Every structure is written in structure tokens, then in C-alpha cells.
Amino acid sequence: RRIFCVADERGELLTAGHTVHCDVYTRCTKAQAIQMALRCMNPQVIVCDELGTQADLQAVEAGLACGVVFVASVHCDTLEALNRKPPTARLLAMGAFETLVLLDGRVNPGHAVKVRTLA
């Protein structure tokens, strides 16, 4: 059994009454949520969406240094575009991501159009 934490700053990932056994951080930035989880909960996995700010990426780096696995999303349509974003390019270079899943968000939300193993 793994210890999960969810950084859900706008309450979009898990709604009230969810049945998933995990700690959920809402109403704070992803970076703050990740930092609090690392300090207080000793998570094995942190789930968050829409990584984008420098603070988000620094918090993910801190989590990776602690051995935490991340399930995260980034708004991007190709691996090449992901590499053009300096913060995410740095995470890719570090080997932070094992798998890339591209979703067809505009036409068919939630539908995977490509799955690529990176590690």
C-alpha cells in the first residue's frame, strides 16, 4: 500500500465526498501543497495537474530528491513542445518522467492519442 497525496489547488481533481484514501491539499498553490506534503506526510506518490510555474517545478524537484513519484499533467501537445519549455525541459533531462501520455483534449477530452515510455 502506498501513501498518496493530492495537490489540488482549485478542487478539480477530487471533490468533496471522494472515496480515495489519501491526503488532499486544496486552496493553496501546488508548490505549497507539495512542500507541505513532503514536510508532514512522507508521501510515496503525489498527484497534481497543470505544472507550469517555476515554483511548481522546484517543488517537484524537491519531491524527486526525496524519492517521491509524481503523477502530473502539463499543458503541451507534443514531446518537442514540452522540451521547448525550460522548466519542463529540465525535468525531462533529469529523468523525472517515465511515461508521456498525450491527450486529445480539444476534440475528445480524456482520450489518449499517444503513450510513450521515456525511461
Language-model regions: role of each:
Residues 98-119:
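Conserved P-loop NTPase
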Residues 6, 23-26, 72, 102, ...:
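Structural signal for conserved beta-strand scaffold positions within catalytic alpha/beta enzyme cores
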Residues 1-39:
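P-loop NTPase switch/communication element
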Residues 42-43, 47-100, 105:
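Conserved P-loop NTPase nucleotide-binding/switch module
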Residues 18-21, 75, 111:
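Histidine (H) residue identity feature
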Residues 26, 90-92, 119:
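Short, low-complexity, polar/charged sequence segments that are solvent-exposed and flexible
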Residues 13-16, 80-82, 109-112:
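Switch/connector loops and helix/strand junctions flanking conserved nucleotide-binding motifs
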